[in-house]
Swiss-Prot record:
This is Pantothenate kinase. GO terms for biological process: coenzyme A biosynthetic process. It is an enzyme of class 2 (transferase). HAMAP family: Pantothen_kinase_1 (MF_00215). The gene is coaA. Pathway: Cofactor biosynthesis; coenzyme A biosynthesis; CoA from (R)-pantothenate: step 1/5. It comes from Rhizobium etli (strain ATCC 51251 / DSM 11541 / JCM 21823 / NBRC 15573 / CFN 42). Disulfide bonds: none annotated. It comes from the Bacteria. Its EC number is 2.7.1.33. GO terms for molecular function: ATP binding; pantothenate kinase activity. It catalyses: (R)-pantothenate + ATP = (R)-4'-phosphopantothenate + ADP + H(+).
Amino acid sequence: MSIATEIIGVPEILDHFQSESYSPYHFFSSEQWAKFRADTPLTLTGDEVKRLRSMGDPIDLDEVRRIYLSLSRLLSSHVESSQMLFDQRNRFLSMSDVTKTPFVIGIAGSVAVGKSTTARILKELLGRWPSSPKVDLITTDGFLHPNAVLQREKLMQRKGFPESYDTGAILRFLSAIKAGRPDVKAPCYSHLVYDVLPDEYKIVDRPDILIFEGINVLQSRDLPADGKIVPMVSDFFDFSIYIDAAEDEIHNWYVTRFMRLRETAFRDPNSYFHRYASITDAEALEIAEDLWTNINLKNLRQNILPTRPRADLILKKGKDHLIEQVALRKL
């Protein structure tokens, strides 16, 4: 019997599946998942983890050992398998002058759930494999339409929703990456000014692995009436991860983070949210609750959570922000 089938009942990680025998996923507790680390070395220090984690995220070396070393080992096997398939296909086609395109990992999940921390931790771990792969990290924030466009289209209150992104630009970027093109530009975003930075780009030059992180990366698109092929962002992924948590927990993390930002980033006069630094705690709490209820909760329910079943791996967090359950798609 596999470890996955030893779990009593099915976790709430995928509550729409009634039995693991009918689920496309294997389920593991964090303790069971930790055993898959095997002899994977810990290549991060405690200080490095503190530097990589986002505000309010308590991830530490113990969490890296429990969850991320096993995940690093799993991803290593996928990357190696991808390389083997690439070599076999080249032999089949009698091609010898072809360079393998980047292995792309997509990371999705709600605002405030910890996607950025996961992405940064993975970037460091993967880059320290014995093979020393080149790993780049890009977020979808830079692919938001500029505020001027959102204001003109009356979409500022829909920022983060699918229509607020330049999906065409995302698809062109990923197409160029998967085509193996050099020096591909990714637009930059500033959380300080809450806007895309004009004429500022990050250059992605043929990495071995690209981590692409954002709330919308697993979303599907409606098929056009004319029947033309419409690519989805996830079509370019070799592996995808969804960071999951109970709705109430994400709500609490979002509000807590907002209140902490009032004491830090919002105090910068250049901050888009500087006006919130001088209001009372009660007023700030009311604003945070309103932003959660009318924007982020709606986006989670309508657009983000429905994409969860499309992920290859689901990491379910508990109330302490630490991962409690893992679901891995069956092959």
